[in-house]
Amino acid sequence: MIYTKRLWFSNGIHHHYSTKKILPNINIEYFETLINNTDVNLLPLEKDQTVKELLVFLCPLIFDPNVDSHKVVLDQDIDMIKSSATNFYENISQSEVEEFHKEEINNNSTKPVSHGLNSKLLKKSNKIAERIWKEGGMYSAAIEKIIYWLKKAVTVAENEIQRQPFDKLIEFYKSGNMKIWDEYNIIWIQDTESIVDMVNGFIEVYNDPLGYRGSFESVVSIKDFEATKRIKTISDNALWFEDHSPIADKYKKKKCSWYFSKGNHSCCGIW
């Protein structure tokens, strides 16, 4: 049960920080006994798959420390894509991924988009394909549910500046267009008044060894007015902290711009 709880906490067989594979404190024989004595109807069998075939698939993944040893490998001396257990890529090498994005990235753009943030790259018949995470694309069933609830949120938005990001995010999930994702974020960051806030999308990229693809995250938070007041007090006095910081005067700023920040009373989310 300890092993099960560790998997729940880390959302998989790899530790959420070290990304190292979590090994169970039981042996294979005991695990096989548990599976063989479980009702077949309760096992996650593929079509026409036998219990024996399921065990052949599962046992190396669970017990062999050399199989998918790390979710993310950052050793630049080896192929980081092939060495990582992340599912953002399939049958493709690091050099192929880098070359794929090199062709589409415009370094001269004043508003570059995050190419690859919402897609999976795979190679079939020596051709690289990109599967976009959107309505009608990869993960469509789940994304349609997201769109459903965002449409509900539109009807109860506190104000116009809160409603606009909802509409834009729906547009993004329908199209998968990363330019729309940028437009959404620009609108979202301008909402400094709403009591309820939301973060939703394929955002954090640390599960991708190359930092292209984002993992889904959704958080709803409620503003803590007292905490926000304290944070604003610090922000309003930023120049005082700059003046009294233990660094050489030539490195100190003469003027500090105030930025918006807020404290959250409570959060509810999934990562």
Give the role of each language-model region.
Residues 1-104:
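Extended, Lys/Arg-rich, non-catalytic nucleic-acid recognition/anchoring regions
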Residues 61-271:
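Fold-level signature of zinc-dependent metallopeptidase catalytic domains
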